[in-house]
UniProtKB/Swiss-Prot annotation:
Top-level taxon of the source organism: Bacteria
Provenance organism: Helicobacter pylori (strain J99 / ATCC 700824) (Campylobacter pylori J99)
Keyword terms, alphabetized: DNA replication, DNA-binding, DNA-directed RNA polymerase, Magnesium, Metal-binding, Nucleotidyltransferase, Primosome, Transcription, Transferase, Zinc, Zinc-finger
An example molecular function term from Gene Ontology annotations: DNA-directed RNA polymerase activity
EC number in record: 2.7.7.101
Toprim domain segment(s): 246-327
InterPro entries: DNA_helicase_N/primase_C, DNA_primase_core_N_sf, DNA_primase_DnaG, DNA_primase_Znf_CHC2, DnaG_bac, DnaG_HBD, DNAG_N, DnaG_primase
Binding site for Mg(2+) 2: D296, D298
Classification via Pfam families: DNAG_N (PF08275), DnaGprimase_HBD (PF16730), Toprim_2 (PF13155), Zn_ribbon_DnaG (PF01807)
Record gene name: dnaG
Protein name: DNA primase
A GO cellular component annotation in the UniProt record: cytoplasm
């Protein structure tokens, strides 16, 4: 039999919208998703899916249930078959037991009772309450996250309420002495942070001591309910906000989460003192949010951010990394009323791929040519995980970080373009650009270049040697669709049918050159305002000025 805890974990981890949308076409409608019911014939949509609560309901035929029941009904599978199919699809390990089919209601109830005892103790301990308030926590936050305190009185509370001690040992609330047949409080003299499953059941605890010599934080030991490699602190309170905002902030500490929620960042969660692991991904991916890693800027924080970014980059997740330097962290910034500064920092993450490349470059002594060569091989090896389009996007960054020639990375260096002229025509010097006032608008120019590429696909090989999608401000999606050969994209079809785009024989190179010129002119304005270091800014500015000069002389220059 499959353990009940294993089934609960699967349901808490998978996204019902992702499950059902692979069978029927779901459309967003308010806070829910709607579709025509797959279980009876209808013309208007009456089948509703609630992503937050994880269930579906049809107002027409009354069909309802969770992800497992949907797969059972749609594919005509047994309960176990549907479970195993979902577990295989989402890479979730199921636990089996040959004996009794366990129901963990008693376990959840016990942990909830213990959590209540901890809460009562905290409100009778002014010293510990004062500590939390000095850290910036309000009473409302302390109550919302149900913080508590473990004192010797908890033993009396357990006895008084007749709680099952053997169960509490299994669940990690109590420990048992090896030498004496006695139990002891595992979290004695610690501030208690109850840890919840995504469905808001207490499954364990984290405990913080104020003593100097003891381990600052300890968690419940691994058990049938508590798996710290897949749980996320605060997720049960954050999940609805994550779905609505399409963004999740991952921090390193319990206090960070509580203070972020208190300051209005209610989409914040934390790992349980562990690195981000593949086991966290199913939960993090629910609702397809942008993932922001909010880590300390010390060596440990940078290394943790690097490992997490490697994983998230390969998963091609949206988001990035924010490192807090100079011993700052979100909790300190909120306590010091620097909320606007924090908002600004969180709005400027470093994309995962870029962060990985910068970290790799920083791991080598780049003054040594052999070290630089090793760095280049590692960075290019990492980029091989991605499409050619993404590789071309990031190769110029590698060139900048390593101060390496572009051709080493397979990027075409600036060259003079030699146009083809029929023998009947006299070759003229490449035409220089007229004054800016006579130039077409950037949007029109972008349309024109893409139209040329649609009309003559052989030009695309030439184009990608010089430009990438970052050149386009208005038509980036169209260029990406073209590179991915999505020729039935409605926006590409519209460009192909646009009668207001005058194409001239042999005119593509001139328009491409003009588009690249406009890009480098923007760079001259944007680079000084960028977060790059001074030396990096100087490198980019010098290259932009040189490129503009060559473009105005009629040469094609690679970006």
């Amino acid at each position: 039999m499959i353990l009940k805890s294993s089934i609960d974990r699967l349901l808490q981890t998978i996204d019902i919208v992702e499950v059902i949308s692979s069978y029927v076409d779901l459309r967003k409608s308010g806070s829910n998703y709607m579709a025509c019911c797959p279980f009876h014939e209808e013309r208007s949509a009456s089948f509703s899916v609630n992503q937050v609560k994880g269930f579906y309901y049809c107002f027409g035929c009354g069909a309802s249930g969770d992800s497992i029941k949907f797969v059972m009904a749609f594919e005509k599978l047994s309960f176990v078959e549907a479970l195993e199919k979902l577990a295989h699809r989402f890479n979730i390990a199921l636990e089996y037991d040959k004996g009794v089919y366990y129901d963990h209601k008693e376990d959840y109830h016990l942990l909830e009772m213990v959590s209540s005892l901890y809460q009562e103790e905290l409100f009778n301990a002014p010293f510990f309450l004062n500590y939390l308030q000095k850290r910036g926590l309000s009473m409302e936050s302390i109550k919302a996250f149900k913080l508590g305190l473990c004192t010797n009185k908890i033993d009396y509370g357990i006895e008084n309420k007749g709680l099952n001690k053997d169960k509490l040992i299994e669940l990690g609330v109590l420990g048992k002495s090896d030498k004496e047949d006695k139990t002891y409080l595992r979290f004695l003299d610690r501030i208690m942070f109850p840890i919840y499953s995504p469905s808001a059941q207490v499954v364990g605890f984290g405990g913080r001591t104020l003593k100097e010599k003891a381990a600052k934080y300890i968690n419940s030991p691994q058990n049938k309910l508590f798996d710290k490699s897949s749980l996320l602190y605060g997720y049960h309170l954050a999940k609805e906000h994550i779905y609505k905002q399409k963004q999740v902030i991952v921090t390193e500490g319990y206090l960070d989460v509580i203070l972020l929620h208190q300051a209005g960042f209610k989409n914040a969660i934390a790992t349980l003192g562990t690195a981000l692991t593949p086991s966290h991904l199913p939960l993090l991916k629910k609702g397809d949010p942008e993932i922001l890693l909010s880590y300390d800027g010390d060596k440990a924080g940078r290394n943790a951010a690097y490992k997490a970014s490697l994983m998230l980059a390969k998963e091609q997740r949206k988001g990035g990394v924010i490192l807090f330097e100079n011993n700052l962290d979100p909790a300190d910034m909120i306590a010091n009323h620097q909320i606007e500064t924090l908002k600004n920092w969180l709005s400027r993450p470093i994309a995962f791929i870029e962060f990985v490349l910068r970290h790799m470059a920083g791991s080598y002594l780049l003054d040594d040519p052999l070290e630089k060569d090793k760095a280049l091989k590692e960075m290019l090896g990492f980029l091989k995980n991605f499409s050619l389009l993404l590789q071309n996007e990031y190769k110029p960054l590698i060139a900048t970080l390593l101060q390496a020639p572009l051709h080493v990375l397979g990027i075409r260096e600036p060259v003079s373009f030699q146009p083809f002229y029929p023998k009947t025509e006299k070759p003229n010097r490449p035409q220089k650009f007229a004054h800016v006032s006579s130039m077409p608008s950037l949007e029109f120019l972008e349309k024109l270049v893409i139209r040329y590429l649609l009309e003559d696909r052989s030009l695309l090989d030439l184009a990608v040697g010089y430009i990438h999608s970052g050149v386009f401000l208005h038509k980036k999606q169209e260029f990406d669709a073209l590179c991915q050969e999505k020729l039935d994209d409605p926006k590409l079809v519209a460009l192909l049918l646009d009668a207001n785009l005058p194409l001239k024989k042999g005119g593509f190179e001139k328009e491409l050159r003009l588009l690249i010129l406009r890009y480098f002119e923007r760079q001259l304005k944007e680079i000084p305002k960028s977060p790059l270091s001074f030396s990096e800014k100087m490198i980019f500015l010098k290259r932009a000025r040189q490129a503009i000069m060559k473009l105005k002389q009629g040469e094609l220059v690679a970006i």
